[in-house]
UniProtKB/Swiss-Prot annotation:
Protein name: Small ribosomal subunit protein uS4c
Subunit structure: Part of the 30S ribosomal subunit.
Lineage top rank: taxon: Eukaryota
One cellular component (GO) term of this entry: apicoplast
Name of the gene this protein is made from: rps4
Pfam families reported for this sequence: S4 (PF01479)
Residues in S4 RNA-binding domain copies: 85-145
Keyword rRNA-binding: yes
Keyword Plastid (UniProt): yes
Location(s), subcellular: Plastid, Apicoplast
Species this protein is from: Toxoplasma gondii
């Protein structure tokens, strides 16, 4: 476990970031010596941007390509907005899970319901007014989610969201409210487009 955690910190070091919210729950210490590499080519910069996105959201290559095709068809959303509408990303953003990995585990183990239907697919794309809630019979999972919500919102004095989510562990997805939860992640979508030649 310790070795796995160290490799995560090394990846952050490689990306020249101190934090990737969906990938690692710890901050990289600033005093660590950066990894020395050769000259940076344009391809390498594009590759790094793609890798940041891939590791943060736990995506595969074919999934990223598929989302770019959605952008061409819909002509509305950008890449990050489509990925943020995935069920695993939404569970993480709401604070029910500490990381994307934990959110994926909650979904695949059958603890998440959408509009009274059990969903076990982390890549499920949500729409406006979808009702998301935790299985009320799973008391240990409810306790874990409440603890996660406490550390996400209550300590930051965002009591409105905390009381909204924690009482019944339900959340109705609304466009205006949803994007207020969006946390800044340093992705350059244009560089990722150039990498995939879209």
């Amino acid at each position: 476990m310790k070795k796995k955690f160290r490799t995560k910190l090394k990846k952050l070091q490689y990306f020249k970031l101190t934090f990737l919210p969906g990938f690692c729950t710890k901050l990289l210490k600033k005093e660590l010596v950066p990894i020395k590499k050769g000259k940076t080519s344009s391809f390498r910069i594009q590759l790094l941007e793609k890798q940041k996105l891939k590791y943060n959201y736990r995506l595969k290559e074919n999934q990223i390509k598929k989302y770019f095709k959605y952008i061409k068809l819909l002509k509305i959303f950008n890449l990050i907005q489509i990925i943020e509408l995935r069920l695993d990303a939404t569970i993480f953003r709401l604070g029910f899970a500490k990381s994307i990995n934990q959110a994926r585990q909650l979904i695949t183990h059958g603890f998440i319901f959408i509009n009274s239907i059990l969903v076990k697919k982390p890549s499920f794309i949500l729409t406006e007014k979808d009702l998301i809630y935790i299985n009320p019979k799973k008391f240990t999972i409810i306790l874990i989610c409440r603890i996660n919500l406490f550390f996400r919102y209550y300590n930051k004095y965002n009591l409105y969201i905390y009381t909204l989510c924690v009482e019944y562990l339900k959340f109705k997805l609304q466009k205006e409210f949803y994007f207020k939860l969006y946390l800044f992640i340093p992705f350059d979508e244009n560089l990722i487009k150039y990498y995939y030649k879209f």
